[in-house]
Amino acid sequence: MKQYLDFLRLVKNTGTNKTDRTGIGTTSLFGYQMRFDLSDGFPLITTKRVHLPSVVHELLWFLSGATNIKYLQENGVRIWNEWADKNGDLGPIYGVQWRNWQNVRGESIDQIMQVIEQIKNTPDSRRIIVSAWNVGELENMALPPCHAFFQFYVALGKLSCQLYQRSADVFLGVPFNIASYALLTHMMAQQCDLEVGDFIWSGGDCHIYSNHTKQVEIQLARTPKTLATLKINNKPDSIFDYNFEDFEFINYVFDAYIKATVAI
């Protein structure tokens, strides 16, 4: 995806050297946006391999409302291991906030069900929003939400989604996050009998970790290939009933995996 490589190059060439919580150090750029027309193909980068089982299983896990890594580990997904406690728990992260946000009266709000109802019944609403940034529970989360806030938009029979990501690990995290929310947009569109429109990714602190510099150079030397196509082979009664096997990524051609260490 040229948009992503242009972004990666811009951060590398114009970013500011900054310290960070992990102690590794970053080259950082504040504020950037990319737009992907989902009808042109699925926005899965081709200049390195993305581990699709991790993308799909993590999204299904979020949608289930779970915050224990047991399901992920059972399906060979280890991306949350470093943050979990000895029992595998992560505190009230994405799954809880998406499906079980507690209001001041102690009532549970299922934000995913709420936005589905809005898309179906009030598609012109400017309030079709899911937030994972629950200020009152941040201190209890293993990691505060990086992809914190997303909004849906309906026009001309198409569903679009915009994500705001407050903290963006441009080399490791962003390709994964783009794929995850593009997949969610496809699922929501199918459930609401709409076509897919655009996915817009908006980043706050967009950074390349100092220990990813060589990997970035390798990736920038590669040439993007034609995007894959997503085929959803089943339409369950609920967005919560999809299975991993329901998703087929057709003609995903990619360059070799580039190993890099995640900052903890």
Swiss-Prot record:
Active site: 146 (nucleophile)
Pfam families: Thymidylat_synt (PF00303)
Binding site for (6R)-5,10-methylene-5,6,7,8-tetrahydrofolate: 51, 169, 263
Pathway info: Pyrimidine metabolism; dTTP biosynthesis
Catalysed reaction equations from the record: dUMP + (6R)-5,10-methylene-5,6,7,8-tetrahydrofolate = 7,8-dihydrofolate + dTMP
Molecular function terms, GO-annotated: thymidylate synthase activity
Any one GO CC term of the record: cytosol
EC number(s) recorded for this UniProt protein: 2.1.1.45
One biological process term in Gene Ontology: dTTP biosynthetic process
Residues that coordinate or bind dUMP: 21, 126-127, 166-169, 177, 207-209
Keywords from the named record: Cytoplasm, Methyltransferase, Nucleotide biosynthesis, Transferase
Subcellular location: Cytoplasm
Family matches, as InterPro entries: Thymidate_synth/dCMP_Mease, Thymidate_synth/dCMP_Mease_dom, Thymidate_synth/dCMP_Mease_sf, Thymidylate_synthase, Thymidylate_synthase_AS
Subunit structure: Homodimer.
Family: Belongs to the thymidylate synthase family. Bacterial-type ThyA subfamily.
PANTHER family: THYMIDYLATE SYNTHASE, THYMIDYLATE SYNTHASE 1
Primary role: Catalyzes the reductive methylation of 2'-deoxyuridine-5'-monophosphate (dUMP) to 2'-deoxythymidine-5'-monophosphate (dTMP) while utilizing 5,10-methylenetetrahydrofolate (mTHF) as the methyl donor and reductant in the reaction, yielding dihydrofolate (DHF) as a by-product. This enzymatic reaction provides an intracellular de novo source of dTMP, an essential precursor for DNA biosynthesis.
Listed HAMAP family: Thymidy_synth_bact
Listed name of the protein: Thymidylate synthase
Species of provenance: Ruthia magnifica subsp. Calyptogena magnifica
Taxonomic placement: Bacteria, Pseudomonadati, Pseudomonadota, Gammaproteobacteria, Candidatus Pseudothioglobaceae
